[in-house]
Amino acid sequence: MTLILGIDPGSRITGYGVVRQTARGCEYVASGCIRTGSGELHERLQIVFRGVSEIIAQHGPVTMGIERVFMARNADSALKLGQARGAAIVAAAEAGLEIAEYSATQVKQAVAGTGGANKEQVMMMVMHLLKLTQKPQIDASDALAIALCHAHTRSSLVPHGLSTARRRGGRLRL
């Protein structure tokens, strides 16, 4: 049994999802959003860092999947997103978690079967795979999808010894 944290980073809303990976598949543990409000950027980044740290302390995941930054039309937004990712990554690294990064296309492919899936399709598959009866918040749904993608990737890497080989070395880029 492995607890996996998925993070959908954002400078205003960061989604998180925790799943338990067992031999039978994945089970829902928790999800939600870290809302940073409209303060100064450094204050919002501190809220992301503390929020992720609290989630790790509360649930005890051993590994984290996080979405990579995509190049947005607005460079300022992409920079802020990258900084929020950094705050979440540092929180996970401080706690000793294995960290893996995934593109949005990889997450959609792993969860919905196609890299072109829309947010509603991803959410419906997350609900189906985790047997959820209520729709999670969209950012939490994305984070759960990232956690499921990470679980799927770990399942295919573990038989080859790749997951544990990189555990202490920091980020595992896929």
UniProtKB/Swiss-Prot annotation:
Keywords: Cytoplasm, DNA damage, DNA recombination, DNA repair, DNA-binding, Endonuclease, Hydrolase, Magnesium, Metal-binding, Nuclease. Its cofactor is Mg(2+). Transmembrane segments: none annotated. The active site is at D8, E67, D139. Mg(2+) 2 binds at E67. It is found in: Cytoplasm. GO terms for cellular component: cytoplasm; Holliday junction resolvase complex. Its main location: cytoplasm. It catalyses: Endonucleolytic cleavage at a junction such as a reciprocal single-stranded crossover between two homologous DNA duplexes (Holliday junction). The keyword Hydrolase applies. It comes from the Bacteria. Mg(2+) 1 binds at D8, D139. GO terms for molecular function: crossover junction DNA endonuclease activity; DNA binding; magnesium ion binding. Its EC number is 3.1.21.10. It is an enzyme of class 3 (hydrolase). PROSITE patterns: RUVC. The RuvA-RuvB-RuvC complex processes Holliday junction (HJ) DNA during genetic recombination and DNA repair. Endonuclease that resolves HJ intermediates. Cleaves cruciform DNA by making single-stranded nicks across the HJ at symmetrical positions within the homologous arms, yielding a 5'-phosphate and a 3'-hydroxyl group; requires a central core of homology in the junction. The consensus cleavage sequence is 5'-(A/T)TT(C/G)-3'. Cleavage occurs on the 3'-side of the TT dinucleotide at the point of strand exchange. NCBIfam families: ruvC (TIGR00228). HAMAP family: RuvC (MF_00034). Homodimer which binds Holliday junction (HJ) DNA. The HJ becomes 2-fold symmetrical on binding to RuvC with unstacked arms; it has a different conformation from HJ DNA in complex with RuvA. In the full resolvosome a probable DNA-RuvA(4)-RuvB(12)-RuvC(2) complex forms which resolves the HJ. Belongs to the RuvC family. This is Crossover junction endodeoxyribonuclease RuvC. It comes from Pseudomonas putida (strain ATCC 700007 / DSM 6899 / JCM 31910 / BCRC 17059 / LMG 24140 / F1). The lineage of its organism: Bacteria, Pseudomonadati, Pseudomonadota, Gammaproteobacteria, Pseudomonadales. The gene is ruvC.
